[in-house]
Regions:
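Hot-dog-fold acyl-thioester-processing enzymes
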Residues: 2-61, 118-121
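HotDog/MaoC-like acyl-thioester-processing domains
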Residues: 4, 10-14, 72-73, 84-121
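Short, well-ordered turn and helix-capping elements at secondary-structure junctions
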Residues: 22-24, 62-69, 99-101
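Small beta-barrel nucleic-acid-binding modules, principally OB-folds
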Residues: 54-70, 75
């Protein structure tokens, strides 16, 4: 098993928050999907490093990504994650990106996926 801290496996944890700015928008004034995927991968990598107590973790696989809803300028994106499984050489995280309306406090899942990391020597 990978060396790591004792993180609750079934509890989603807030990892990062990103305000949506004009420069983050695509052609239809929605959050650009590539920007969201970059935030998701970077957040998951930081979480994997924390779980495994090492900065030597790299993304090896991102499962299917289905964009369920759009997000607009002025909303916040909150990225949550939890440990899905820990193997002898890999770690899989379940990740969610949620749009957060700062006025109402409502959140909607806009993307969820599993991301697998391995430790490099």
């Amino acid at each position: 098993m990978l060396k790591g801290t004792m993180i609750k496996r079934n509890k989603m944890q807030l990892i990062s928050t990103h305000p949506i700015k004009k420069s983050d928008l695509g052609f239809h004034a929605n959050l650009f999907g590539g920007k969201l995927l970059a935030w998701l991968d970077a957040s998951a990598a930081a979480f994997a490093m924390e779980v495994c107590d090492t900065p030597r973790m790299v993304t090896v696989k991102i499962d299917e990504c289905i964009f369920k809803k759009s997000a607009k300028e002025g909303q916040m994106i909150k990225i949550y994650g939890k440990v899905e499984s820990i193997g002898t050489t890999s770690l899989t995280l379940y990740m969610e990106a949620r749009s957060h309306n700062v006025y109402s406090g409502r959140q909607s899942i806009i993307l969820s996926t599993n991301i697998t990391f391995v430790r490099i020597d």
